């Protein structure tokens, strides 16, 4: 399906909040990452050529750009656009500059280097970058001694980005909220929006329309001022 970005999601969200942006992006990101894992990665060996901007899984090769790197020694994240001494060609760092342009209000995307923690890590930053991208893309973590590079992958099969039906949406949504810290209302809204699924919303209810089936999600605010889902039912 044609890419729909998180940036024009109709629900209100704080453009300066990493948690809000992550919540919007996580649903679709997890879905497509899981599909890529099943269809492309599997048990294949992988290889990255950052100078050519290519990543290989087995015998399959795709275009890849460097988002940034995690350092286990310094416990920091460094965007590729800020790593001026890397020697990487412009085409390999273009995606990180695109993410910087797309998210001008998000401090973490405007700061070249910062400390890692539970929220600020390569996976979360990559999911937001993928969600804001105008293209259908996934990401991959490429470990090396002392850290890991996170790359954004282009040219993947379209089936990875196919629309999720009601069962797949619910299965993925429930799986995410079971073990991933996020705002459940923004997670649902961002997932449905990027999935191309019509939905209505207010502060405490989202109703999604999957053809003739309507699913209602009810939320409440928690003490840490994020939304938690209280009920999922069929209308």
What residue ranges belong to the model's regions?
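Secondary-structure transition/turn motif
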Residues: 56-61, 82-83, 154-156, 209-214, ...
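Generic surface-pattern signal
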Residues: 18, 24-27, 31, 41, ...
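Short, solvent-exposed secondary-structure boundary motifs
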Residues: 32-36, 117-133, 185-198, 207-211
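Surface-exposed beta-loop interaction hotspot
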Residues: 84-182
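Alpha-helical oligomerization segments
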Residues: 164-235
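Short amphipathic beta-strand/extended segments with alternating polar/hydrophobic composition
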Residues: 62-70, 152, 215-221
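N-terminal leader/presequence regions that precede the main folded/catalytic core
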Residues: 1-95
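Short, ordered beta-strand-loop transition motifs
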Residues: 43-51, 143-145, 200-204, 221-224
């Amino acid at each position: 399906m044609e890419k729909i970005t998180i940036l024009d999601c109709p629900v209100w969200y704080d453009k300066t909040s990493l948690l809000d942006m992550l919540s919007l992006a996580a649903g679709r990101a997890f879905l497509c990452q899981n599909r890529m894992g099943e269809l492309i990665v599997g048990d294949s060996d992988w290889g990255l050529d950052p100078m050519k901007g290519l990543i290989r899984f087995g015998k399959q090769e795709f275009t890849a750009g460097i988002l940034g790197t995690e350092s286990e020694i310094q416990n920091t994240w460094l965007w590729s656009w800020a790593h001026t001494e890397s020697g990487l060609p412009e085409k390999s760092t273009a995606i990180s500059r695109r993410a910087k342009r797309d998210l001008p209000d998000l401090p973490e995307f405007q700061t070249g280097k910062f400390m890692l923690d539970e929220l600020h890590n390569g996976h979360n930053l990559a999911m937001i970058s993928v969600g804001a991208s105008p293209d259908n893309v996934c990401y991959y973590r490429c470990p090396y001694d002392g850290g890991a590079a996170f790359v954004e992958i282009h040219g993947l099969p379209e089936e990875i980005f196919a629309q999720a039906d009601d069962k797949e949406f619910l299965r993925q949504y429930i799986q995410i909220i079971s073990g991933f810290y996020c705002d459940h209302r923004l997670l649902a809204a961002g997932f449905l929006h990027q999935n191309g699924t019509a939905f209505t919303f207010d502060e405490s209810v989202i109703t999604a329309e999957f053809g003739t089936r309507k699913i209602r999600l009810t939320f409440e605010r928690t003490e840490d001022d994020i939304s938690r889902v209280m009920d999922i039912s069929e209308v």
